[in-house]
Amino acid sequence: MLRDDLAGIRFDGNILPPPVMNVQKHTFEGADIAVIEVFPSKTPPVRYKGRIYIRTGPRCGIATYEEEIRLSEKRISGNLPFDTQPILGATIDDISTDLFQNGYLPYAIAPEIIDNNQRTIFEQMTSLRFLTKSDGPPTAMGILIAGKDPQYWIPGAYVQFLRIEGKELTDAIKDQKEIRGILPQQLRMLDELIRLNISVALEIPDYQATDIKIPDYPFKALQQLICNAIMHRRYEGTNAPVRFYWFSDRIEIQNAGGLYGQATASNFRTTPDYRNPTIAEAMKVMGFVQRFGVGIKIADKELAENGNPPLEFQFESTYTQVIIRKKI
């Protein structure tokens, strides 16, 4: 009787979506016990009587809005990631076939394979996940890598740059830019912008004939960190840009979306995960990423060698921020 009552929890409508569970009877030290095995939901968040409950240590409580977002992202990670989902309303005409053929395809596929295969360009685009199917809509990655107007379809897919003469956001703004276009264009423009804003001091050590150039920030560290922000940010459900704020004493880079998948605040340097795996793949194909999982390590190394303080990270459920302190 008790076993039937427990099994009936699955169907009483209080838990939605209905849980997948097994209820079994076992005997332990002469007494009958019921063992309930509940399997993780593939479509979180799960609600009980309209509420989402989470466990934080020994406490069980109702999830906040930010915690609900994190649970929803787990659902996405179990299905197609956003960057491979179709952009509804967009068509093949919204992708630049010239950009794809000349700026991506030769780097993604070996030349002899391109020469020998008989695929149409649309079949090639589908194979490389720029289209959902040869006559279907483009994917988010296709729009971001080779779209004619990516910000029309994904409004937050740009970088907001501010150069501030002071330590507070309310201080005078020396320069401001919105870095738009496809992601490869953004990354190239950001490289140039970083080089223009780095200050280089000259030191002449005793008994040496050559000057030593010491930048206030190492270029490679900033390059890796802004690339990480663009690669790992959340594009869906937000119109927030990547924020690249250059203060007089520090740089702040903030992107939408908290840590994803198996990455946590304690293991993100050694156990990365990818919210946008096909965008990450595309950035690797085009040479913006040499190896996966080493961006933060490169930044750490460059900053240490240049004499900058260690990176400071802030992880929230809705955004991630890194602070790079100026060389003292």
Show which residues each predicted segment covers:
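Conserved N-terminal catalytic/coupling substructures associated with nucleotide/phosphate chemistry
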Residues: 1-221, 226-328
